[in-house]
Amino acid sequence: MEQFNVWFTVSEVQGLVKSGGLADVAKALPQALKALHQQVAIALPAYRSVPGKEDAELVLETELTHWPHTQYRVLKRDLDGVPIYLIDCPAYFDRPALYAENNQAYADNGERFGFFSAACLDVLPKLGIQPDIIHANDWHTGLVPFLLKTRYRYDSFFEQVKSVLTVHNAIFKGIFSYHQLEVIPELNLSGMEFLQYGHDHVSMLRAGIAFADKVNAVSPNYAAELLTPLGAHGLVDDFVRRARDLHGIVNGCDYSEWNPRTDHYLPATYSDEPESMRKGKALCKTALQEELHLPVTDVPLFGMVCRLTHQKGFHYLLPILEQFLRNNVQVVIVGTGEPEVAARLNKIAHYHRAKFAFVETYSERLAHWVEAGSDFFLMPSEFEACGLNQIYSMAYGTLPIVREVGGLKDTVNDYDKFPERATGFGYQEPTPEALLITMQRALLFYLQQPEEMLKVQQRAMQQNFSWEESAQEYMKMYRLARFG
């Protein structure tokens, strides 16, 4: 097995800073690559909230010319054996949050992450790090492949270096005006007009798609959706242009974090052995009900942990939620996001206190409790590049109810379509009614076929979405990027 030296550039890493699923991937994939004897290091902004900065090793003090804030430092620390290089420029990153405050994005985000992308390349010769592959992620580092092919095109240090871009969510395109990105003169070079998005703006994600040697989406089905107008969110021509270089690789599950046999968050651990699962999940359900002041009773419990956004399908769930609550069920939703969604959920919780609990916060502990204590997990997403919660749910014997988009279609087998290999429930139609029918289908399954449900739960728990397999797929893509 050949060894690649991978420079992983990303805006968040679980265990240091996290706002979403990108951080989970950014921790787990480098670790999986390292376990396969690859050389990997991560570049991350030195946000105020990164723990252990004061104890990190100062490895470089330098400057990036042509920037309003040119001085920056590089701090080095370790995360579970993977070196992390923190790009420390307080003017850009010493702030209370990563991207936004009070639901308002920082006005200079384009400049901030343009700087970070430029610094990710600037530090390599200065630190003597010679990667084979530079791995960019989403719009935040979309300019890394672009700068590699423009600013560093004739630099002998970068002559053999190839880049890949992982698209975790194409709806976030990193659109900023040319004025906001005037610190990157390469964007105004002749022939770069195709990077324009709308009038006088440029998309940092588009730049990455165009200039990376290989591009991947975080599931095969999402890669296929990116080649359609509906799935590409305004970038269909860009993805079609790169169709031969576009790959789909399903995210893995970090089973060291999400494993009901060893989960330190849970009030009771359990395995896929029937008696262990029955007993363990019952204890977890009781603890969840007590925590959320729901009646402690053995009724089917439907859970949901996510951001409160259109993407997560609340425009499908909210119109039918109260109708569904007429059944003898309980529903638990945990998350933060759009104020109007939260307001409606709070109102429903007020009128249905015995059946519905809404917790407007994100808690890692509570997320684990919902995964273990629920019987079903709701994911009626408008779109879902890969999705991780359906994989976590299956690991905990909690059957996912998914709209079959993106990675949800790749990872969950619907009971009605595939009874012999079912791991949950799926549907396709983008309507509240289709969601309600599927939830009712799951409810009847719980009530009428308890032994069959136990078999499906066992099968779900036995699914293996290990990062080792995903990392091997990434290595195949690295090989293609490097050697063709």
Swiss-Prot record:
Q: What class of enzyme is it?
A: transferase
Arranged from A to Z, the UniProt key words for this protein are: Glycogen biosynthesis, Glycosyltransferase, Transferase
Which pathway is this protein engaged in? Glycan biosynthesis; glycogen biosynthesis
Q: Which domain of life is it from?
A: Bacteria
Q: What does this protein do?
A: Synthesizes alpha-1,4-glucan chains using ADP-glucose.
Database matches in SUPFAM superfamilies? UDP-Glycosyltransferase/glycogen phosphorylase
- Gene3D superfamilies in the cross-refs: Glycogen Phosphorylase B
Q: Which residues bind ADP-alpha-D-glucose?
A: K18
Catalytic reaction list: [(1->4)-alpha-D-glucosyl](n) + ADP-alpha-D-glucose = [(1->4)-alpha-D-glucosyl](n+1) + ADP + H(+)
EC numbers on record:
2.4.1.21
Write the gene name: glgA
Entry similarity comment: Belongs to the glycosyltransferase 1 family. Bacterial/plant glycogen synthase subfamily.
**What is the organism field in this record?**
Vibrio cholerae serotype O1 (strain ATCC 39315 / El Tor Inaba N16961)
Q: What protein name applies here? A: Glycogen synthase
Q: Which InterPro entries match?
A: Glyco_trans_1 (IPR001296), GS/SS (IPR011835), Starch_synth_cat_dom (IPR013534)
The Gene Ontology biological process annotation of the record reads: glycogen biosynthetic process
- Any one Gene Ontology cellular component term annotated for this protein: cytosol
> Does Glycosyltransferase appear among the keywords?
yes
